[in-house]
Amino acid sequence: SQEFAWIEQYLYLQKARFEDAFDYEIDLQEEYDMWPCCKLMLQPFVENAIIHGFKGREIGGMLKIMAKGQGEYIKIVINDNGYGIPEEREKAIQEIIKGNDVSDDLRIGIGIRNVVARIHIFYGDSAQISLWSKEGEGTKFEFLLPYPERKEECI
């Protein structure tokens, strides 16, 4: 989808901006290049990996994005070897993923809240998002998305 092209352009620009503090790989199975996808669905997760995961890093950051088929679904993984998410913030993000309200005290960005809501509207209840993070080791988001029931474009 156009989403992966935008992400590749975004990563190219950010890599230049941060003077090669990180590298990236995108592994997209060709048959899933046309999978219907919400606009800017992955960007907030990729941006957070760069801004927070690689903050202060001069070399050695690695961001991997993979999309492949899994039955009637597409599985998208965003994985970094950054600093990881502090436990309290991770718990708050887990609650957002479950659709629960969380306090703004932790300043969880609107980007993740917005994307999670749009994914569930567009793909339905069978869409799954999971998060794994360990401080000092990195963060991984996984999306398991069915072919959308809705035919109109996701906003």
Language-model-detected regions and their locations in the chain:
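Two-component histidine phosphotransfer core
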Residues: 1-132, 140
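Gram-positive cell-envelope targeting signals
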Residues: 151-154
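Short C-terminal beta-strand
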Residues: 139-147
